[in-house]
Amino acid sequence: MTSKSQRVLLTGGAGFIGSHVAEALLRRGAHLWLLDNLDDFYSPAWKKANLEAVGRVGNYEFLQADICDKPRLREALERARPQVVIHLAARAGVRPSIEQPSLYEQVNVGGTVNLLEMCRKLAVRKFVFGSSSSVYGATSRVPFSEEQVELRPVSVYAATKLAGEMLCYTYAHLFALPTICLRFFTVYGPRQRPDLAIHKFTALIEAGKPVPIFGDGSAGRDYTWVDDIAAGVMAAVDYEPRPVDGVPFEVFNLGNSRPVKLTELLELLERIIGKKAVLERNLPQPGDVPLTWADITKACRVLGYRPAVPLQEGLERFVRWYRMVRFRVAAA
């Protein structure tokens, strides 16, 4: 378990997943530093509210810094002197990455290199990297297993996350930095970004506005409750990667392993909200994949990972949360 004396630095700590991981760390007594640049990819007001929520759980130190700003990043890490680094900061989003490929490469690849270099220089004991199910691309081999070696991402975002994984492996190989990569599958829950499907669909259905659907609605996603993801991250913090060929590096899927079609998701939301969705049908978008489906056998066996919240229950919880914060949503 994370002890009170263990120093943990979490990048992207003001974000959706990061703020939940921060709360989990504080509940376990970690000495926590949160690093975030509070950028405007979506309203910084959301991120500040996330930080306030974390502060209600426990005390932490906040470091406003950009992982692309090497001098500021060095200053932040030298101040924190972490034993463990959890790297969740990233430029997110499949569709925007196709429009801004250089920015995604700069942040998700260059920023990760900057952080790994600082971890090497400061002799950090463990590096946990938040990756994505998107690295699997449009594979027909299901469920998606960590054993799959031919990964063909179909978006710039996915390619940058896979590049991040490869950099993690390289640093583990060259410098014996114990590293764990966690591939997150379609995470949802309170504080979800406003542009993500469940948040966006809920807001539009509640308001009686058209819900844009890309494709025929048959695309399936392995929706995973955010606290289940946070529990998986905690298990990774506790775990020492088993060296393969002398390299202390491992990859784990964190998902629910129960993919649901888009049409089924909308039907669930309609029942929970009590309103019918007004659908606006569009052609499929570049970068989207037909299915995500996590094989979580390895995470269950090695990390003790056990997703606990089924989709119906998670959506009910999400809608309750949304209704409590809807006026802040409108203001943002």
Regions from the PLM with identified roles:
Residues 1-187, 317, 325, 331-332:
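N-terminal Rossmann-like NAD(P)+-binding domain of SDR-like oxidoreductases, especially those catalyzing
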